[in-house]
Amino acid sequence: DGFVTDADLTATVENTSIATGGRDAESVDQAKRYAPLYFRTQDRLVTLQDFKAFANSFASNYGSTGKATATVRRAFSSANIIDLFVLERASNSQLRRATQEYKRQLLAATESKKMLTDEVVVVDGLVRTLDVVVTITLDEKFRRSEAQLIQSARRSILNYMNIDNTDFSEPFVPQDLIRILLMDETNIRYAEVTNVEKPIKVGFNEIIQLNNLAIRVDYV
């Protein structure tokens, strides 16, 4: 599944999908996003934001963490049913369906912190994979530096799509990706996501994850 190239067109393709794996220590981006929220829970789970912050900071006894979001279902009784939609981290760039053990441990961890009238249900979140094709336009003088510029652009795109920088229900907006890419890579004259024209929206329990990344190069 590559791309045809000619003398003035170059493409690189990267499949970012993997099957399984662990994870490193909590990233700086993840800490910035969730640590202040978790601190504000004061070790009690009352609001949906409390549940979300707790689940996103939770680590199983085998060191696995994930991404989560929370919604509430109003029951006919006085109890609220809190749905925790979770995905387990397979690596620093990939999420997967959470294992039963991970979900069991997460549910058990909420028991002593939730309100007595709340019922917590741990549910599978959904991953929506996305292939991205980006064409970058460079000045002719950078032809000899093409490989380095492609690699630098790739790092910028992967960082933008990193799971620590995305969340449930967040759309993919190609214009936002290009804006960040051009801010990061000042030697790129012009860039375009050529296979996605409009923002891609997802449901509240879905998260967009990069699958294949291809970078093509034009010269002027």
Predicted regions: what is each one?
Residues 3, 8, 85, 133, ...:
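Intrinsic disorder/low-complexity detector
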Residues 42-173:
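Carbohydrate-recognition loop of C-type lectin domains
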Residues 1-53:
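Catalytic P-loop NTP-binding/switch module of NTPases
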Residues 1-2, 8, 117-119, 169, ...:
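Glycine-centered loop/turn motifs
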Residues 19-20, 61-64, 201, 219:
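Intrinsically disordered, low-complexity segments enriched in small/polar residues
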Residues 123, 148-220:
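An aromatic-glycine-centered, glycine-rich loop/turn in mixed alpha/beta architecture
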Residues 23-30, 34, 127-144, 180-200:
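A broadly tuned preference for mixed-charge, low-complexity surface segments
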Residues 11-13, 68-70, 191, 215-217:
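Generic structural motif
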